[in-house]
Amino acid sequence: MFLLGDAFTAEAKKRNFEFYDPLTTGDSSLSSCVEAIIAAQVGDVEKAIRYGLAAILMDLANVGGNVKDGCHIASMGGSWMMMTYGLGGMRDDDGNLSFWPRRAPEDNAILRFPVTYRGQMLEVEIGLENVKYTLREGISLTIRHETEEIQLTRENPESVRPVSGG
């Protein structure tokens, strides 16, 4: 459902997540980040953050008790994916970069991340009410915010849109 997200309806994702989430053991260092992404996609932001923190803390808090054997590099990458694909709602379906950002549950929470896409650097900053897209490097980049197409250029590098997801 994550990798081929456009092949599932929102309702199918929600039904599947609600069915499988209680059955999933979560005993892999890779479970939490993907569970967080799907939780965010189906609108359960609090659960997304809970799963996301488990991925982030995998090594920092020695969750599995095995950091002495080495770091969980894939879980670290999964933490970034949870932030960008999960809470940021980033997708690259059919070669089109789009975002369906989720509203953070905390009043003062801000999520900011860079994305390099086709040689252009985009910064995404998600606040409580708005998301700001800024073209940091490059000439021109077309993205989608939910269903709206946005053209960012050197002359007009910034766009602010309301956050409706979450």
Residue ranges and their predicted role:
Residues M1-A10, A61, V67-G166:
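Carbohydrate-active enzyme catalytic cores, enriched for enzymes
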Residues M1-H72:
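Active-site core of glycosidic bond-cleaving carbohydrate-active enzymes
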